[in-house]
């Protein structure tokens, strides 16, 4: 019995030592995970014709620096980049354009394995796309619309990658290059969006406050005030929710392409940005009216200031994003569950086949 116990103990000890020996390489592999810089180096070294791309890209960048802008009235420079900087810095609705190139590069890093595996070759038909990009810029240069030239600039970069690395690269990099669209300033074109957004937000806010909450208000177009005119708020273009719509649309586009593969699901996620952004702006406007009504009732004469505080507060200005992000994640959860339910019958049937 003692001999059997000793033998069992020895076998258990040997098994433990073997497990430790087997786990050491795994730990070494975990510790040897490549760094971000190493992964970037791997991506760059895996791309052919790098010298050709750098030469074409450098020429493209220099061209738009010296012949990119013809509207010298706003900022006295021919550089498209200086005009972009001026536009981004003077419009809060367009300042997202500063970080769009970084977002695109970051998502290219995220897709590095896919980009490395696609077949690459020099594809001369992409010269048609490059010519088309130059044509877009020429139109913008002639009509003095620098934002049109920005479209040509970004589309040209996308076309140059197709010229150097082929059509499969263009297909694989369509997203995130699609996000370059958010680097184009909206400018005066925003009026076609801000006006209907202002009216929609005003109508919904007026109905919620007046009908659901029973607040004695008067709505006249985009202006909402209480019946005694103690506080008045106008939903102007700056309060239409355009900024939150742009940010929400950009985030939803990223989320749609990253989390889903089916086109209709991606489209559903992206399109949901419009109603959810409006819902977020309505929440903010409703809180402004509520704050004004509560303080006006408690301290007469303080209602307008209370509403202005909610409007101007930096933290409270983030409120429109809360229902938007919660809504899209719920929608994404529903779509994900739909995917899982579709796979369950397949698993069951495969199990039956195995049993047979």
What residue ranges belong to the model's regions?
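Hydrophobic cores of alpha-helical transmembrane segments in multi-pass inner/ER membrane proteins
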Residues: 97-108, 155-164, 175, 247-253, ...
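Membrane-interface transmembrane-helix boundary segments in multi-pass integral membrane proteins
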Residues: 92, 234, 240, 269-277, ...
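N-terminal membrane topogenic signal
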Residues: 37-56
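Extracytosolic (periplasmic/ER-lumenal) interhelical loops and adjacent juxtamembrane/interface segments
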Residues: 65-92, 100, 192-231
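Membrane-interface loop-to-helix entry segments
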Residues: 94-99, 144-149, 232-254, 315-322
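Hydrophobic alpha-helical transmembrane segments in multi-pass integral membrane proteins
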Residues: 89-130
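Membrane-interface helix caps and helix-loop-helix hairpins in membrane proteins
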Residues: 138-148, 164-169, 188-192, 235-238
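Cytoplasmic-side transmembrane-helix entry/capping segments in multi-pass membrane proteins
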Residues: 119-128, 148-153, 170-179
């Amino acid at each position: 019995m003692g001999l059997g116990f000793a033998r069992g103990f020895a076998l258990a000890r040997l098994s433990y030592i073997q497990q430790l020996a087997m786990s050491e390489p795994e730990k070494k592999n975990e510790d040897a995970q490549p760094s971000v810089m190493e992964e970037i180096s791997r991506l760059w070294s895996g791309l052919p014709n790098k010298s050709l791309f750098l030469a074409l890209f450098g020429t493209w960048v220099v061209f738009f620096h010296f012949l990119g802008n013809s509207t010298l009235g706003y900022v006295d420079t021919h550089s498209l980049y200086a005009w972009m900087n001026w536009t981004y810095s003077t419009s809060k609705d367009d300042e997202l354009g500063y970080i769009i190139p970084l977002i695109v590069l970051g998502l290219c890093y995220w897709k590095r394995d896919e980009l490395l595996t696609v077949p690459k070759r020099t594809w001369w038909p992409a010269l048609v796309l490059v010519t088309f990009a130059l044509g877009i810029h020429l139109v913008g240069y002639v009509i003095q619309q620098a934002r049109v030239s920005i479209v040509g600039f970004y589309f040209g970069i996308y076309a140059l990658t197709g010229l150097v690395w082929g059509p499969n690269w263009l297909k694989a990099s369509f997203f995130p290059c699609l996000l370059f669209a958010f680097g184009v300033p909206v400018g005066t074109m925003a009026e076609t969006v801000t006006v209907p957004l202002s009216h929609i937000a005003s109508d919904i806010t007026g109905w919620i406050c007046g009908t659901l909450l029973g607040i004695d208000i008067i709505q006249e177009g985009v202006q909402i005030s209480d019946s005694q005119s103690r506080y008045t708020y106008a939903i102007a273009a700056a309060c239409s929710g355009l900024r939150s719509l742009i940010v929400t649309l950009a985030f939803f586009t990223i989320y749609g392409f990253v989390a889903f593969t089916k086109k209709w699901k991606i489209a559903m996620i992206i399109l949901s940005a419009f109603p959810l952004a409006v819902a977020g702006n309505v929440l903010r406007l409703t809180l402004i009216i509520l704050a004004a009504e509560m303080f006006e009732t408690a301290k007469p004469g303080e209602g307008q200031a209370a509403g202005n505080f909610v409007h101007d507060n930096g933290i409270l200005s983030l409120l429109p994003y809360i229902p938007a992000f919660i809504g899209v994640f719920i929608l994404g959860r529903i779509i994900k569950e739909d995917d899982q339910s579709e796979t369950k019958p397949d698993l069951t049937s495969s199990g039956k086949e195995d049993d047979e």
